[in-house]
Amino acid sequence: MKFEYQRKQMVESQLRANLVIDESILDSFSKVKLENFLSDNLKSIAYIDDNIFVNQDRFILRPFILGKLISNLNLKNNSTVLDIGSCTGYSSAILANLFKKVYSVENDQYCFEENKKNLSSEKILNVKLFNNNYLNLDFEGMQFDNVLINGELNDDPLFLINLLKPNGKITAIFRDKKNSYAVSYIKKQNSFDKIRIFDASSPLLIDCKNKEPAFTF
C-alpha cells in the first residue's frame, strides 16, 4: 500500500504538475512498479523526485524528465522505439505500454543482468534487450520510429541517424558549454532538425566527444 500511494503521488505531483498530461503516459507510470526495478536497499527511495543511482555510475532518470522526454516522441501504438541507457529496465517497462515493440540497450553488465531479470519477472514480452556499446549499435539495417536516450549527451547524436526512419524522433538531454536542456531531433534526409523542448539536466550518459559511453566496465 505504501508504494501504491507513493506511485500515485509521483504521477500527480511530479508528472502531471510538470505538464506531462498525456493520459496514456500517466497510465503507464501508474501501472509500472518502480520498486520492482530496484535492489532492496533502494526501494525506500523509489519515488523520490530525483535520479536514482543503482550503482556508482548508472542511474534511472528523474520521473518527470523521463515522462516529458517520452511525451515528445511519436506516440503511436504500432511504432517502435529504441531505449538507450535502459538501466535496470524501468524506462523500457514504461515504453512497453506505449509502443508495439521496444528495443532496449544497456551497456553496464550489472544493469543488463538486472534488466533482463526484471523484465522477465514483470512478464513484459514486447521488449528485446541488448548489451551493447551505445556508440556502436548495429541492428542490421533496422530503423526505428523513435529513440529515447536516458541521460545527457555532450554532442549531437549523429551516430544514430541511420537508425531512424524518415521523420523519426530522438529525445535526450543535451549539454553544451554552458547549459543542459532537453532536445528533440527529427530526421530530415541525412540530417536532423534540433528543437530545444524544456530545461533539464541529468548525469552524462554518452560521451560522444570521446567516442565511447561515459560509463563502461
Protein language model features and the residues they cover:
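Conserved nucleotide-cofactor-binding alpha/beta core module
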Residues: 74-196
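Generic structural signal for secondary-structure transition and capping sites
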Residues: 34-37, 124, 169, 202
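A general structural signal for well-ordered alpha-helical segments in protein cores
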Residues: 7-8, 66, 92, 182
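Conserved SAM-binding loop and adjacent beta-strand
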Residues: 19-20, 35-42, 52-70, 74-75
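Substrate-binding/catalytic lobe of Class I Rossmann-like enzymes that use SAM or dcSAM, i.e.
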Residues: 182-188, 194-217
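N-terminal auxiliary segments of SAM/dcSAM-dependent transferases
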Residues: 1-41
